[in-house]
UniProtKB/Swiss-Prot annotation:
This is Uncharacterized protein YkvT. GO terms for molecular function: hydrolase activity. The keyword Signal applies. Residues 52-95 are annotated as: Disordered. Residues 1-26 form the signal peptide. The lineage of its organism: Bacteria, Bacillati, Bacillota, Bacilli, Bacillales. Residues 71-95 have a biased composition (Basic and acidic residues). Induction: Positively regulated by WalR. Expressed mainly during exponential growth and rapidly shut off as cells enter the stationary phase. Keywords: Signal.
Length: 208
């Protein structure tokens, strides 16, 4: 079989024009050169790719570690103390004086217990929804207390009123749970009279 192909090749070379033979040889050389250059170019691209991204293959199997707080930071967060009752219920001197003046104006002539109860109403309101959360805010809330409207809130409090206010401020157990008080002989508001009465002290009715 090989002998037949060899003979055929010799026959073609003998009868093929010289120009045709040269053209065929040139085409074969050109194709060989093209394949060589292509292989060289691919090798160049592959080398450059590896040099440009050297960490891709090395890092692909690495796992991303979560960020962790330092031991010092974690300890600081865990050791953060909660506020104590004393820290939560701190009052300024200005608030104490204002509460004393309200007690003096609202409970003048009342017993010491009655004065403490009036102060307790103010403090109870600071802890209830619907009221300001400061002593000043509660006392100066619109239409909340008559002494604010008529100016008697500005009178200097007597000693007993100051002591009653201080006892209410320092006591963990309030004299009353009421958030309202009124004098039934002088109160003209029907709404305040509709509130549930919890106790009566002197001339005042205390309600919720």
């Amino acid at each position: 079989m090989t002998t037949k192909f060899t003979a055929l090749a010799v026959f073609l070379l003998c009868f093929m024009p010289a120009a045709k033979i040269e053209h065929t040889q040139a085409s074969l050389l050109s194709a060989k050169k093209t394949k060589h250059e292509e292989a060289k170019w691919l090798t160049h691209i592959d080398r450059n790719t590896n040099e440009s991204f050297p960490s891709l293959s090395a890092d692909k199997d690495k796992k991303i570690k979560p960020i962790k707080l330092s031991a010092h930071t974690e300890k600081k967060e865990k050791d953060k103390p909660d506020k104590t009752n004393d820290e939560k219920e701190t009052y300024t001197q200005s608030e104490k004086e204002l509460l004393s003046r309200l007690v003096h104006a609202e409970a003048k002539g009342e017993s010491y217990k009655g004065k403490v109860a009036v102060a307790s109403v103010v403090l109870n309101r600071t802890e209830k929804k619907g009221f300001p959360d400061t002593i000043r805010g509660v006392i100066y809330q619109k239409n909340a207390f008559e002494p604010v409207a008529n100016g008697s809130i500005n009178q200097k409090p007597d000693k007993e009123s100051i002591e009653a206010a201080e006892e209410a401020l320092s006591s963990k157990n309030r004299e009353t749970d009421a958030i309202f008080f009124y004098n039934p002989k002088t109160a003209s508001d029907n709404w305040i009279r509709s509130r549930k009465i919890v106790e009566k002290i002197g001339r005042h009715v205390f309600a919720v």
